[in-house]
């Protein structure tokens, strides 16, 4: 710390707000669980200290509830006190073999090994499996990357490529090495740090002042690489399209890396979207590119807010299909095309609103780790809610909300209350009754778990022109 040796150790995490801190002697303060409170085999009334790391996707969700969290929190103690408000530098030198993290649903994330290197996709917490960091989404430092790897290998990271330096043979690299330097001036959330190494082809081009990188593992077949490139070439156009709603693209670069490992998911790594399994698809590119605004530039303040950014990224997929309908009907400048765009969104909402079964049974703002990235509560339900909000506010005001949020919270994080306050500000009818109705809308769509079935067991406030009771109409009319 500040150039002086420091003590360090690894401790178990404790539940948020524990008055006894990280050294709480009560074992119940360090238990894992899918639910809050833990309520494990000893009926623990405390919140969980970590999510259980299920060994595979076949293991029951609650199998590890009530077990002890691992001692994986690095605690550094400086040799001298640090003054309030002062700047200090912590340097951590470490060695190890990067790996993967088992999540609360049994899937894995982290540094996936490939025959020629590694491929990084780490949502929500697996950056800790290859580097020490404050592993929480609202912690957003800037990054400089300097990776020395075997000669002939390529390093793909966030931001812009600063330099590539060839090095002579050494004891560590008998065949020579190459040092890749990348720089991100923009802050990056903990789970969005990219640092893949391998036999990647790397190209770049600049469109509208943004440098777009494209990287593919060279072991991907020629025909698939060509198909991938055709979709990657769409990224500048997709960025321009999504900018109509969100405002200017928030970074100086963008890009896509396509690796070969078949991992659990593709991911919106900041400025360098990661696609797995050797392939890319257009729907997902619209989704992940939307994340550059939502999740990347404006990050959720905690994991319970995952629905906020995944819902907006799902909305981008709805916008994509509405765009296709618009083009087929005459294009964005024709009345027929514009009508087709709006009709596509209405149809998408109505289809989702008819959902039954377990679609409505988990509140988006209160997910379990087991279903965080696999349930309708994270993707389709908030995506439908945003369509309804667009109908309630009108397309123009809806876009103004998105752009205001980017200006206000860009580079930082956002809470649910802050998100909802912005929509309240742009509600066309500012009466007390309409403001109260919008508050009820958010409670129903974001914060309520309904019994199984749908029908009467689903939100009872929708929007103008949509299935359901609407917003400015009975019951509970506002004016």
Where are the regions that the model predicts?
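Extended, low-hydrophobicity, Ser/Thr/Pro/Gly-biased non-transmembrane segments
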Residues: 23-80, 87-197
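Second-shell loop/turn segments in exported
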Residues: 75-81, 219-230, 274, 302-303, ...
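Zinc-dependent metallopeptidase catalytic helix centered on the HExxH motif
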Residues: 138, 272-349
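Extracytoplasmic/secreted proteins, especially bacterial periplasmic and envelope-associated proteins
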Residues: 144, 230-241, 284-288, 307-315, ...
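Juxtacatalytic substrate-recognition/specificity segment
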Residues: 145, 178-181, 199-305, 316
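Long, His/Glu/Asp-enriched segments that create or flank divalent metal/ion-associated functional microenvironments
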Residues: 239, 451-479
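Amphipathic alpha-helical substructures
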Residues: 328-333, 375-462
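The feature captures the short pre-catalytic strand/loop hairpin that immediately precedes
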Residues: 354-372
């Amino acid at each position: 710390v500040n150039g002086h040796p420091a003590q360090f150790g690894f401790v178990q995490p404790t539940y948020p707000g524990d008055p006894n801190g990280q050294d709480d002697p009560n074992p119940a303060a360090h238990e894992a669980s899918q639910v809050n409170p833990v309520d494990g085999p000893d009926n623990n009334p405390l919140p969980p200290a970590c999510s259980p790391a299920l060994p595979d996707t076949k293991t029951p969700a609650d199998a590890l509830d009530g077990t002890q969290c691992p001692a994986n929190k690095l605690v550094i103690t400086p040799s001298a006190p640090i003054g309030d408000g002062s700047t200090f530098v912590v340097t951590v030198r470490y060695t190890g073999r990067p790996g993967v993290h088992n999540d609360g649903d049994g899937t894995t994330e982290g540094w996936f090994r490939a025959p020629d290197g590694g491929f990084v996709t780490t949502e929500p917490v697996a950056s800790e499996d290859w580097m020490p960091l404050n592993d929480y989404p609202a912690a957003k430092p800037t990054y400089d990357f300097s990776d020395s790897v075997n000669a002939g290998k390529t390093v793909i990271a966030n931001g812009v490529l600063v330099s590539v330096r060839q090095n002579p043979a050494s004891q560590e690299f008998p065949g020579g090495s190459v040092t890749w330097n990348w720089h991100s001036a923009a802050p990056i959330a903990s789970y969005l740090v990219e640092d893949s190494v391998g036999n990647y082809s790397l190209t770049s081009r600049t469109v509208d002042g943004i440098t777009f990188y494209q990287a593919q593992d060279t072991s991907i077949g020629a025909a698939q690489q060509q198909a991938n490139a055709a979709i990657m070439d769409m990224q500048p156009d997709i960025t321009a399209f999504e900018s109509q709603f969100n405002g200017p693209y928030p970074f100086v670069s963008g890009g896509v890396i396509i690796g070969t490992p078949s991992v659990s998911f593709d991911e919106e790594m900041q400025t360098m979207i990661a696609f797995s399994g050797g392939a890319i698809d257009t729907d997902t590119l619209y989704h992940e590119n939307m994340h550059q605004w939502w999740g990347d530039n404006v990050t959720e303040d905690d994991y319970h807010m995952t629905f906020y950014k995944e819902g907006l990224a799902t909305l981008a997929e709805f916008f994509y299909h509405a765009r296709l309908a618009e083009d087929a009907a005459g294009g964005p400048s024709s009345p027929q095309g514009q009508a087709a765009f709006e009709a596509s969104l209405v149809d998408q909402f109505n289809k989702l609103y008819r959902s039954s079964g377990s679609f409505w049974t988990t509140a988006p703002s209160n997910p379990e780790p087991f279903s965080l990235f696999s349930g309708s509560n994270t993707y389709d339900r908030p995506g439908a809610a945003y369509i309804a909000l667009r109908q309630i506010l009108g397309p123009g005001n809806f876009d103004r909300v998105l752009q205001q949020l980017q200006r206000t919270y860009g580079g930082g994080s956002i809470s649910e209350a802050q998100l909802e306050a912005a929509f309240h500000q742009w509600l066309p009818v500012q009466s007390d009754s309409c403001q109260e109705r919008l508050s009820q809308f958010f409670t129903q769509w974001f914060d309520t778990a309904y019994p199984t079935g749908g029908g009467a067991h689903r939100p009872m406030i929708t929007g103008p022109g949509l299935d359901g009771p609407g917003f400015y109409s009975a019951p509970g009319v506002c004016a």
